[in-house]
Amino acid sequence: MGKMTDDGPVVKDLVLIGGGHSHVYVLKMFGMNKLPGVRVTLVAKEVNTPYSGMLPGHIAGHYTWDECHVDLRPLCTFAGHRLIHDEAVSIDYKNKRIVLKNRPPIPYDAVSIDIGITPAASVAGALDFTTPVKPIYGFGARWEALLERVLTTETQTRVVVVGGGAGGVELALAMQHRMLSELQKAGQPSDRAEFKLVTRGELMPTHPAATRATFRDIFASRGIELVEGNGVKTVSKGTVELSSGRKIPADECIWCTQAAPQPWLAESGLDVDNGFVKVSPTLQSTNASGVFAAGDCASVVGHPRPKAGVFAVRQGPPLHDNLRRYLLGEALVDFTPQKTFLGLISTGSKHAIASWGSLSLGGATSTGAMLWNWKDKIDKKWMKMYQEMPEMTAPEPEVAAVALAAGPATIAALRAVPMRCGGCGAKVGASVLSRVMARLDIPTHPSVDIGLDQPDDAAVITVPPGKVSVQTVDFFRSFVDDPYIFGQVAVVHALGDCWAMGAEPHAVLAIAQVPYGLEPQVEETLYQMMAGATKVLAEVGCALAGGHSCEGKELALGFSVHGVAERKSLMKKGGMKPGQVLILTKPIGTGTLFAADMRAKAEGRWVSAALTSMCQPSAAGAEILVKHGATSCTDVTGFGLLGHLVEMCKGSNLSAVLDLDKLPILDGAEECLKLGITSSLQPANVRLSRAVANQNEVSGNPRYPLIYDPQTAGGLLAAVDKDKAEACIQALREAGYSTTCRIGETFSNLPAVATAPEQLVYVQDAEHQFASSGEGKIRVKTVTVDNCNTGACEAPSKFTSS
C-alpha cells in the first residue's frame, strides 16, 4: 500500500475501466504474473460485480448476493492493483487521460474498457416506468425492492417482462419462482402475482426450434402468458402499449431488451458501431492506439456476436495477452471468437435446458435437474477463481522489459532511483512542484496574509482580535492505494483535533512524501493526493498556506494546522461534568477493517462505507456540539475509543459508563474481528484495559475489542448535558452524521465496582448493567499508553495528557 510498485518505480500505467467478466481475468493474471514497472489501476463504479450466469439463480433464491458477485477490492488487494471507486465519463485518447465523474482525470499508457451496457431510451416511458435489467450490477437491488412492493400489496400484482431472448426468459421464470415461493411462505395465495412476457419477434430466435417449443410449454404450464410478434410502443404508469395497439395492464414492468452502449464512448471520439466501441480482432480500438475494449460494450470488426456473458469470459485471456504485448512494445495477436456456444438456460426451479446448434434437451425432468447441477458446478467454479486467491511469493525484481520498451531516457531515470539523496536533496523537484501547484485549485482564507498566492519563506497568518490560536499536527503513511482518497482522509484526520477543541481551522501547512519514481508519475501522485486534500479544505473554508514535499519509499501526508477560537468556547478534554451524556458522531472499526483489507479479507462494500465515513469532515458536527453546550470533546483516533475516553476522564477527574450495545460500528468490523484480525496498534491500546473496572465480566462480548480499535479520521466524542442530548443527537443526524448516538454517561465515581484507582470506566452490555450508588471520588492516576509507529493511526510523537 502506498508503495511504488511491488517491483520498483512505475514506468507505465495500465487502467481498466469497469469490472466486467473480461477484466476480472485480466486483474487476476496481472497479479499472478506481474509485469515489472507496470501499475494496474481499476476504475469501477461498483466494487462488487455480478456474474451474469448466476443472476437468474440469485433472483430465484438459489444463490445469495455474495455467492454471485465478485468482490473487486480483495481481488485488487491480492493482485497489488489500485482500485478507484468512481465512474469514468470520458476518455481523452489524444492526451491519454481518463475523465472521472467525481475526481480529477487520471493518465494512462494503456486502457481497457469493459463496462457492459445500459438501458436503451428508444421506447417512450421505458426509462421512467420500468425496472431495467441492465446494467446488471444494480438489478439485484432493484429486484429486491420490486419483490418487497409485491409482498406488501394486498391486491394482485401484474408483472410484464419485456424481452424474449434467453435473458428475458430466464428472468421471467426465476422471478415467478421466487415470488410464488415468498407468497407461499407468507401464507398468501399464488394468484397474487400474474406474469406476462412480451417479445417483438418470436421467443428466443437464436436458439433451435426444439428449445423454443420446450420453453413455450414451460410458460404455459406455469401460467405465464406469452405475447410474441408484438413490440412495445410506449410504457406509462400502469400500462404497456404494444405496437398492435393492445394495452396490457402492468403494475411492474421488467425491461430486458434493447440495451444500449454508454453514450460517452461515442462522445469521446472513439470509432463506434451503433455506439459500441469498434475494435479490431486484437481488441484494440480501430482509431485510438492503446485503447482496448471487451465484453458487451465492444464490437469486434468482422466478428459480430450476441451480447452474452460467455463471449466476455472468453475474451479475458486474449485481452490480457494483448495488453501485455502492447506494454512491452510487441506485435498484437488476433483473436477469433467462437461462433456457437452451449447454452445452459435455467427454468426458475433447479432445472435447466441445454441448447447447442439444433440440439435441445432437459426441462422439468431428471435430465433437466442434472443439467442444472452441471451448470451450478460450472458457475461456482468460475466464481471460485475470483473469490479464493492463492498465496503468492514475489519474485526478485529484474530489469523491466517495460522500461526497455520505453527507451533509453526511461532506463537512465530508473538507474538513478536507488541513489536518491537525503536532506534537501530528497525534495520533489521545483518543476514538478510548480506544475502540481498550477493544476490545483488552492483554497485561501482572509486571515492568511502571506501564503501560496505570494510564496515566501514562511506563511504569515493574522489571529483575529479576541481569539486564541489553536495549533496541532498529524502525519502518517498511506493505508489505501488511492492517493486522492488518502489526501481527503489525511486532512480530515489532521483537522479533527482542531474541530474537537471547538476551533475553526484557518490554514494548514502540508508535509507530503511521494514514492521515488519517474517525473511524470511523481507529479501525478502528488497532484492526486493534494487534489483530494484541497477538496476537503475548500469544503470547510480552510487555506492551504504552504508546505514541504519530498521523495521516500512510501506515500505519506501530514498537516500542521492553525485554527482560532474564543477562549471561553474551547471544548477541552478536562471539561466533563457528572451526569452528562457521552455522544459519538461516527462509527468505529477502521483499524480492524483496514488490517483485514491489507490481507484481502475485507469485503469491498465494507471498505467503501468506511472510507465514506472517514472522508466526512467533522466541521459541522463540532459546530452543533458547541451550539448544544458540549463542555468537553475529543476526536477518536489512534488510541481508540477507550483510550480517548480515559483521557477525558482523567482530565475531568471523573468516571464514565460505556454502553457496548449502543456503539455505532462500521459494517464488517465485527466480522473482521471474528477472523482474528486487528490493527498493529491494538496490542498497545489493550494495555489500557486496566482502566476498565469490569473487564473480566465484559471481555467476552464480541464488541469489546472494538473499544481498543485505533481509528483514522474518527468521529467526535463529546459530553453534553442530559437535557440537551436528544436535541443534539437529532441535529447531528440531520447534518449527515447518521450513526450519531448516545454511548454512555459520566459519573463522579464508580462505587462498589472500581477496585483500583486507575479503573475509570465501566463497560456495560445487556448482561452487565451499571447502577449508580455509593459515595466517594475516583483518584486520578496517570496511565501510560504505549505507541507504535504504524500507518493508519495517530502519530506516535503526538503530545497528549497520557
Question: Which residue stretches match the model-derived regions?
Answer:
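C-terminal auxiliary extensions adjacent to catalytic cores
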Residues: 10, 349-408
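Short, well-ordered coil/turn residues at beta-beta hairpins
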Residues: 114-115, 123, 256-257, 294-297, ...
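Beta1-alpha1 glycine-rich phosphate/pyrophosphate-binding loop at the start
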Residues: 2-82, 120, 160, 166-209
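FAD-binding core/adjacent interface of flavoenzyme oxidoreductases
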Residues: 2-11, 80-160, 187, 254
